[in-house]
């Protein structure tokens, strides 16, 4: 059975009229074809495939342009689309998001800055393209003014979003003849293709560790909330020993589920990323990806913390046994004096009061153990991150680009 082609995913976004269609035609030309018989993959988004070489495909998702008065709706569409891809397998993630602005309008609006910042916060690789940059050889006042506008746009984008200047690409998508008779050739295509390839590899080094941390934190807060809810909603007024025992077991089960869930999903993502990038490195470097990345695994650590919970629960139960025995001994006294009755009532009141103490103690026990498991997870993920960051991805994508050099882009 023939193995499917390696794919990188690109999302192209921008307001209506910025020249996205011209940009797509310029970069990908006749090799660009709509997938799915031209049907959109989701409302407002169409996808196309570009055959980079015999085994590598660039899949482009093209959003509809922003229409006036629909900024929030458009922003939601974009962020939801990226999020939905992040929840799929790594091969479906967007490795590059191209945000288009037009030099003709010269506008970089605040809501667009905010979209880019939100995308960057999730460790997406964002490349900014400024279209209609056809003034390189234009010595007229209009040409000089446009160059000034483009510089101001680049400065605003880099300052407000933190994007590196190297990730902002001025592009001229169509050939143009200036009034002075000089010809402006299309430019920027090779730079964009280069960034798409680089971003494919940078996703591994930057986004995968981020997603691992993000997933662990979500699981931690989710399980901590569930444990706290169980303890809070349990009444320890009657049948204290049985309830403490039952809650202790539930806490132990939650801790084990939390540890196993994180461990299994982290290992799965590590394995998935290793296999995906192994295919790339095998093709473009003719070596195993494991040469660069020895994928680690999360250790199983929940058992020792479950034992600690059980020991702490046993201590609570032992204290309850002593309290119950004290009350029982007062009950069976033959000489029921006022002092005995007083002591009995006091012991019963103390037993009732202890219900709140039990809840507080159990909450402290559970919180201490889940925090320790969380810390151990984070330490393990830190080692994974260090291992990933140590990989020589620059050599990987440089080699991939070198193999393509000389071919027609």
Task: Identify the residue ranges that each predicted region occupies.
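Conserved G1/Walker A P-loop phosphate-binding module
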Residues: 1-68
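Extended hydrophobic secondary-structure segments that form protein cores and membrane-embedded regions
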Residues: 11-12, 60-62, 95-101, 129, ...
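Conserved protein kinase catalytic core
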Residues: 31, 67-68, 105-108, 137-138, ...
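Short glycine-rich substrate-engagement loop in P-loop NTPases that contacts/grips substrate
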Residues: 38-41, 72-78
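Flexible beta-alpha connector loops of hexameric P-loop NTPases
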Residues: 64-73, 140-145
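Conserved C-terminal guanine-recognition region of P-loop GTPase G domains, centered on the G4
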Residues: 77-164
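Canonical P-loop GTPase G-domain recognition
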Residues: 134-203
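Extended helical scaffolds that flank P-loop GTPase cores
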Residues: 188-190, 194-409
């Amino acid at each position: 059975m023939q193995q499917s082609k390696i794919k990188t995913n690109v999302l192209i976004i921008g307001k209506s009229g910025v020249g996205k269609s011209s940009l797509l035609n310029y970069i990908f030309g006749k090799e660009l074809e709509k997938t799915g018989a031209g049907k959109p993959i989701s409302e407002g988004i169409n996808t196309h495939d570009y055959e980079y070489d015999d085994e590598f495909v660039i899949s482009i998702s093209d959003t509809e342009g922003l229409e006036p008065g629909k900024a929030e709706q458009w922003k939601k569409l974009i962020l939801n689309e990226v999020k939905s891809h992040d929840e799929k397998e790594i091969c479906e993630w967007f490795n590059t998001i191209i945000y288009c602005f037009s030099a003709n309008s010269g506008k970089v609006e605040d809501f667009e800055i905010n979209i880019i910042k939100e995308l960057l916060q999730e460790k997406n690789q964002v490349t900014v393209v400024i279209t209609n940059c056809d003034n390189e050889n234009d010595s007229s006042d209009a040409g000089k003014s446009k160059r000034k506008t483009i510089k101001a746009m680049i400065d605003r984008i880099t300052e407000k979003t933190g994007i590196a200047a190297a990730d902002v690409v001025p592009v001229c998508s169509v050939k143009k003849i200036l009034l002075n008779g000089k010809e402006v050739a299309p430019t920027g295509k090779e730079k964009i293709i280069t960034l798409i390839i680089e971003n494919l590899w940078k996703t591994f080094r930057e986004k995968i560790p981020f997603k691992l941390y993000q997933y662990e934190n979500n699981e931690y807060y989710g399980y901590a909330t569930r444990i706290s809810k169980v303890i809070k909603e349990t009444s320890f007024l009657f049948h204290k020993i049985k309830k403490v025992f039952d809650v202790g077991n539930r806490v132990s089960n939650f801790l084990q589920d939390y540890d196993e869930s994180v461990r299994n999903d982290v290992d799965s993502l590590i394995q998935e990323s290793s296999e995906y990038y192994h295919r790339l490195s095998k093709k473009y470097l003719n070596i195993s990806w494991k040469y660069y990345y020895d994928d680690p695994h999360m250790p199983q650590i929940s058992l020792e913390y479950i034992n600690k919970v059980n020991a702490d629960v046993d201590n609570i139960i032992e204290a309850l046994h002593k309290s119950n025995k004290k009350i029982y001994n007062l009950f069976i006294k033959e000489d029921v004096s006022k002092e005995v009755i007083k002591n009995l009532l006091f012991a019963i009141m103390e037993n009732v009061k202890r219900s709140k103490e039990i809840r507080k103690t159990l909450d402290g026990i559970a919180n201490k153990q889940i925090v320790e498991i969380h810390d151990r997870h984070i330490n393990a993920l830190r080692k994974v991150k260090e291992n990933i960051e140590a990989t020589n991805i620059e050599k990987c994508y440089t080699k991939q680009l070198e193999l393509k050099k000389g071919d027609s882009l």
